[in-house]
């Protein structure tokens, strides 16, 4: 019995280590798939087609989301996250040179530019939370 218990504990520990060390994976959320890096939720995400770009940040209620963001619940592993997510669906009025005004929110945060349709096509890493 003692030996069986010891092996059971060893197996559970190894299983836990393997679970925590899993690589990034894609998670479907609404119409979008997010690329999740374990324990790093504040990174650039896009769907498998490489066309939709999205940025999510932690939020406790829909009232915290800006006008161009959507409130979402996302399960990642065993944890649940409530998020405000920006997507490129807003299709702002572009002037043809990539400075579309549909991305003023992201442009002000990251200094990026869109494709003239208000779509944010720059890959970025949010560094506001690194401090």
Swiss-Prot record:
Residues 91-102 are annotated as: 6 X 2 AA tandem repeats of N-G. Its main location: secreted. Component of conchiolin, the organic matrix of nacre. Expressed at extremely high levels in the dorsal region of the mantle, which region may be responsible for the nacreous layer formation, but only in trace amounts at the mantle edge, which region may be responsible for the prismatic layer formation. It is found in: Secreted, Extracellular space, Extracellular matrix. Coiled coil: none annotated. Sequence repeats lie at residues 91-92, 93-94, 95-96, 97-98, 99-100, 101-102. GO terms for cellular component: extracellular region. Residues 1-23 form the signal peptide. Keywords: Disulfide bond, Extracellular matrix, Repeat, Secreted, Signal. Heterooligomer; disulfide-linked. Pif97, Pif80, N16 and other proteins form a complex. May be specifically involved in the formation of the nacreous layer. Belongs to the N16 matrix protein family. This is N16.1 matrix protein. It comes from Pinctada fucata (Akoya pearl oyster). The lineage of its organism: Eukaryota, Metazoa, Spiralia, Lophotrochozoa, Mollusca.
């Amino acid at each position: 019995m003692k030996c069986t218990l010891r092996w059971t504990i060893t197996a559970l520990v190894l299983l836990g280590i393997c679970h925590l060390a899993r690589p990034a994976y894609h998670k479907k959320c609404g119409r979008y798939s997010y690329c999740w890096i374990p324990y790093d939720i504040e990174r650039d995400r896009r769907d498998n087609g490489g066309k939709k770009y999205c940025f999510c940040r932690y939020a406790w209620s829909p009232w915290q989301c800006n006008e161009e963001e959507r409130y979402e619940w996302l399960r990642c592993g065993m944890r649940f996250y409530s998020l405000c997510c920006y997507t490129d669906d807003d299709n702002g009025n572009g002037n043809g040179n990539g400075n579309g005004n549909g991305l003023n929110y992201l442009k002000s945060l990251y200094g990026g530019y869109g494709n003239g349709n208000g779509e944010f096509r720059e890959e970025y890493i949010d560094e506001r939370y690194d401090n």
